[in-house]
Design a protein with these regions (language model features):
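Catalytic-core region of right-hand nucleic acid polymerases
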Residues: 146, 154, 158, 163, ...
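Active-site palm subdomain of RNA-directed nucleic acid polymerases
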Residues: 299-340
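Conserved short loop/turn motifs at secondary-structure junctions
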Residues: 147-151, 179-180, 326-335
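Helix-boundary capping/turn motifs
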Residues: 137-138, 166, 320
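Non-catalytic, polymerase-adjacent accessory regions of viral genome-replication enzymes
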Residues: 1-151
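Ordered hydrophobic segments in well-structured contexts
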Residues: 3, 20-22, 30, 39, ...
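Reverse-transcriptase-like RNA-dependent polymerase core
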Residues: 88-139, 193-207, 258-286, 301-311
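Glycine-rich, often proline-containing surface loops adjacent to acidic residues and nearby aromatics
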Residues: 142, 282-287, 322-329
Length: 340
């Protein structure tokens, strides 16, 4: 298999015959090829040592108090798994002036409203979004209709069995969700679980998904561009350039673990983050403190974060995607999970 892939990268045409590497990728390839291995390795080890020391210091101090000053305590609690102060310091060190990613963990990200233009896509005119005021004013009526629907529907995907209900209820005790409670003041979206195979211990792996389209929350998001991501052609083109220069390469797919649940919701938008599902004849409800899987705004917030991480790893080669990296790099380069 390895020999087949190597041969394909050296000889086979790309899927898209018109594809050509972006200027930033071409420049990064040239920079990396010209860089002596020893110098590149020393620079990487220096920055990783700095990160490890700085993260350890932040954990001892329960994060920088000053950095979180005037921030919502719930946002700070959700953000404890991400070292926001170190992320901002790294951005300062490398001249990454976009504060969108660090600020996500400081103030929370919007769940509704107009999306900013990232430049990572083509301008597009979408249908007009639903008025947020209408969603707010109709929440009680629509919530009651959803509640009745869940009570009457005996074959809905929102009807949980024991295993799935236990998983959902367990998640409600974690920092990213309010414990089961009265959520009458929120806009409720129905929740369900999908199976994703088995965990290492043999237990069922489940992903909780919330239908924010059914509740109308996603309709309050106004997009201004169609996002585009690097294709497999980009990965092949970069890898081929490496190989043509006689550089050994390695591949790593690095997932950001529980990426969505690490991004807190802007406190002003929590009213739109209510969730509900049915179990054993009764409904269970809660409210999200972090982004639920199913929120339209997630694609943008994930893109902001990945763009920041890409800049931090500018001398590796990454293909953009929402919650994962595909990296083609020299074998001695440190793995992405070393990032804070």
């Amino acid at each position: 298999m390895i020999s087949f892939i190597t041969s394909a990268m050296q000889e086979s045409p790309l899927f898209d015959k018109s594809y050509s590497m972006d200027a930033d990728l071409s420049n990064a390839v040239a920079w990396n090829v010209a860089r002596p291995d020893e110098k590149l390795k020393a620079e990487q080890e220096h920055i990783m040592h700095w990160i490890e020391e700085r993260v350890a210091a932040c954990k001892l101090q329960r994060h920088d108090v000053e950095w979180f000053r005037n921030c919502c305590p719930i946002v700070q609690k959700v953000s404890e798994g991400v070292c926001g102060p170190v992320l901002q310091e790294l951005c300062d060190m490398i001249g990454h002036n976009d504060r969108a990613a660090p600020d996500l963990f400081r103030y929370g990200g919007p769940l509704i409203g107009k999306l900013p233009c990232t430049g990572n896509g083509k301008e597009h005119i979408f249908p007009a979004p639903t008025d947020v005021c209408d969603m707010w004013n109709s929440r009680a009526t629509d919530n009651a209709a959803l509640h009745n629907k869940l009570k009457e529907d005996k074959h809905s995907k929102f009807l949980m069995d024991q295993c799935k209900a236990d998983a959902m209820l367990c998640r409600m005790s974690e920092p990213h969700l309010l414990e089961p409670d009265d959520v009458s003041g929120t806009r409720i979206s129905p929740g369900f679980c999908v199976e994703q195979g088995l965990k290492e211990d043999g237990s069922l792996k489940l992903r909780a998904i919330y239908d924010l389209s059914r509740s109308g929350v996603n309709a309050c998001t106004e997009a201004v561009e169609k996002l585009s991501y690097d294709s497999i052609d980009a990965l092949f083109a970069v890898s081929r350039s490496f190989m043509q220069q006689g550089r050994p390469i390695a591949f790593l797919k690095a997932d950001i673990d529980a990426a969505y649940r690490r991004v807190p919701i802007d406190p002003r938008h929590r009213w739109a983050a209510g969730v509900m599902f049915k179990y054993n004849g009764a409904t269970q409800s809660s409210c999200h403190y972090s982004f639920p899987f199913g929120a339209k705004q997630l694609s943008m917030r994930g893109t902001e974060l990945v763009h920041c991480l890409q800049t931090l790893r500018a001398k590796s080669f990454t293909c953009r995607c929402c919650a994962s990296w595909m990296i083609s790099s020299r074998r001695h380069q440190r793995n992405a999970q070393s990032m804070p």
